[in-house]
Amino acid sequence: GAVHSVVFAGFSAAALSTRINDCQCEIVITSDGSFRGNKILNLKKIVDDALNDCPQVSSVLIAERTKSKIELKSGRDKLLNNLIKNASDSCSIEIMDSEDPLFILYTSGSTGKPKGMVHSTAGYMVGAGYTFKNIFQYQNNDIYWCTADIGWITGHSYIVYGPLLNGATTI
């Protein structure tokens, strides 16, 4: 399994490169842009600027969300839609140990250098699945929505993992 690290889309290129280098990231997944109020953030440009200081990154996968004009770096950048078109419908599973790392989320850095918090596979998933089901009183056939940002632990837990672990329909 691939350990992932989601970062807040509003970070600067410097903040992004610090986190990429700290966790020794080799692949970045981003989108062409993101909506913030009535503005479009050029996420691909922020990633490109960040990667000037991240020589270990070999691939950037880009989702075309805003359809903003972007530059693709030959040999490194790939559009997700093109990859998905040619992808197999099946994928063999990777058996993971319960203590294997699942993801890294970074602290805000408000009290110093941001620290990468490593979350293990089973402990985190049991907690996220249980708290989603019981705190939000999720029932089969409910439609669920969470306003948090996916780059923070609440969004990670209750936009992604908790709903997936409970088979929830999300908006």
PLM regions: where:
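A short hydrophobic/small-residue beta-strand
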Residues: 4, 27, 144, 170-171
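Conserved AMP-binding
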Residues: 8, 148-153
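Short hydrophobic alpha-helical segments of the AMP-binding
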Residues: 1, 47, 162-164
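Structural core segment of the AMP-binding/adenylate-forming
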Residues: 3-82
